[in-house]
Amino acid sequence: LDVDAAVSVDRPVFVNYETSVFYSPSLGGVNSSLNRYVDFNIWGICAVGSSVYVMATYKVMPSYIYLSQTTFSLGNPTILQFYDSPVSLKVNRNSLLAGSKSCDCLYYTCEDGIYYWDLKKQLSTTPVISIPVGMEITSLSMNPDGTLLYVGLHEKEGTEALKGHLYVYDVKTSTLISQYHNIADKPVAIIYKERA
């Protein structure tokens, strides 16, 4: 496969940004989105449950934002939103995305914070979570129920030996529930583990 990036989930999705094609492994080989997105620039892909959500812009008119949903078989997408936006799309190819099936939403990162997307609406134009000054978001994930958002942060100029922090938010309200400071060097993945 000729791909530029992979979306890290239980079932990975691989993206070729130049051709606007993405792939998903299957028992018989690899599923492909074929030419279904050829008219769009893909900026973000997020798997939530058995669905794959795509955030893109229309190549001919980049102010038009295209939001769609498909399955891992990558069949014909369902268009969720296709609209002319007064502001440019905030998500970029370096954005981290995490989705919740139970809350029908996605969170994604940008330079100025973390944004919330209610899957039934257009994208938000302002962040719902601000990042503390001097911190960089290094990880974004959710617990298995999709009710808690885990944000891994790195404080590059911090004075402690361990510069990594974990902030936990309520997915429905974007409210900070708890925070753990100086728990790792640089959090790259936060995984929820059930206690036995």
Give the location of each predicted region.
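Recurrent small/Gly-Pro-centered beta-turn motifs in extracellular repeat architectures
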Residues: 14-17, 55-58, 110, 151-155
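Blade-level signature of beta-propeller repeat domains, shared across WD40, Kelch, NHL, RCC1
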Residues: 161-196
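Intrinsically disordered, low-complexity segments enriched in Gly and acidic/Ser/Thr residues
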Residues: 78-162
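Structural motif
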Residues: 18-24, 60-70, 111-118, 157-168
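Hydrophobic beta-strand positions that form the internal "hydrophobic ladder"
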Residues: 12-13, 52, 106, 149
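Long, acidic/polar, low-complexity amphipathic helices and coiled-coil-like
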Residues: 1-30
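Repeated scaffold domains used in trafficking and secretory/extracellular systems
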Residues: 1-10, 37-49, 82-101, 134-142, ...
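A short beta-strand motif characteristic of beta-propeller blades
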Residues: 1, 28-37, 75-88, 123-132, ...
